[in-house]
């Protein structure tokens, strides 16, 4: 196994476990009843599925992934076409989900009954996001991936010049559109949240600030990576696929780490429920008591 694949697996498996843990935590804990956490949970679920779906695409043309790719192809010869199709679907899903998170914060800052609306309709909103993403991909040309049994290697059917130009224009238009939409909504949200926070009590202010910080941190990460993708669509790299996969992983895993860093409730619940942390905490407390008794 090549070093890059080992790196992908090491940080990927750890991050995937963290994401699953966050999904369970946000779904079952009574501390996370706000609709914001329902939206965040959906975002993490979809990003986890996105990461799983990247593996056929990232391994098909790598020498250390040949056995895995050959097995998938012989099991179902459309596996890589489906994976490539879903990768493009997830590009739209991730972008629209980030916009959805921004819209949640914006609507919460403007409307008093926003939490009730999102609690009722967040599943419908994400169903519409997925439907839109599938429809948007229909505009994109997808070159099928096949296996040459004589040469014993995978290959992608060559696209015509018009098809390549069409794909480049498609990506640039959607990336630029998403980037612009995210920036506009994020700035509007920032203005509304600052205006909204003033009249509330200290506890409510802290809640608004915390949720806004999580949303803005995720938006910032996604915006920077989307800007990078947009700019680099004009440049061709020899290792573009490897770079693209790393960027995709950063987007997919970002929300779980942002919650862990910025959400005090998440850290508090983890601290109070993980046996190892509780045992260590008791040992420290016992040691401190012993020292106090000695002195």
Swiss-Prot record:
The keyword Transmembrane applies. GO terms for cellular component: membrane. Belongs to the nematode receptor-like protein srg family. It is found in: Membrane. One of its GO terms (biological process) is sensory perception of chemical stimulus. It is a multi-pass membrane protein. Its main location: membrane. InterPro entries: 7TM_GPCR_serpentine_rcpt_Srg (IPR000609), NRL-Serpentine_Class_Gamma (IPR052880). GO terms for molecular function: transmembrane signaling receptor activity. The chain crosses the membrane at residues 7-27, 39-61, 121-141, 173-193, 211-230, 241-261. Keywords: Membrane, Transmembrane, Transmembrane helix. This is Serpentine receptor class gamma-53. It comes from the Eukaryota.
């Amino acid at each position: 196994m090549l070093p890059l694949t080992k790196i992908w697996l090491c940080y990927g498996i750890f991050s995937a476990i963290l994401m699953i843990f966050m999904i369970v935590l946000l779904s079952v804990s009574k501390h996370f009843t706000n609709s914001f956490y329902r939206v965040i949970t959906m975002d993490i679920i979809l990003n986890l599925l996105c990461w799983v779906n990247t593996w056929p695409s990232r391994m098909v043309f790598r020498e250390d992934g040949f056995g895995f790719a050959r097995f998938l192809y012989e099991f179902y010869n459309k596996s890589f076409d489906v994976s490539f199709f879903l990768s493009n679907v997830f590009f739209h899903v991730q972008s629209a989900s980030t916009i959805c998170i921004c819209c949640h914060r914006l609507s919460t800052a403007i409307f008093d009954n926003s939490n009730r609306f999102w609690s009722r309709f967040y599943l419908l909103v994400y169903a519409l996001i997925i439907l839109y993403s599938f429809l948007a991909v229909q505009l994109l040309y997808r070159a099928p991936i096949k296996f040459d049994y004589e040469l014993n290697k995978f290959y992608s059917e060559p696209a015509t010049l018009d098809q390549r130009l069409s794909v480049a224009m498609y990506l640039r238009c959607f990336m630029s559109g998403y980037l612009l939409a995210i920036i506009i909504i994020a700035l509007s949200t920032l203005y509304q949240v600052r205006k909204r926070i003033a009249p509330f009590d200290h506890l409510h202010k802290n809640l608004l600030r915390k949720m806004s910080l999580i949303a803005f941190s995720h938006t910032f990460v996604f915006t920077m990576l989307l800007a990078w993708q947009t700019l680099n669509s004009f440049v061709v790299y020899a290792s573009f696929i490897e770079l693209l996969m790393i960027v995709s992983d950063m987007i997919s895993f970002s929300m779980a780490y942002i919650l862990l860093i910025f959400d005090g409730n998440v850290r508090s619940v983890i601290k109070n429920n993980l046996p190892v942390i509780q045992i260590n905490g008791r040992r420290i407390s016992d040691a401190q008591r012993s020292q106090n008794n000695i002195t």
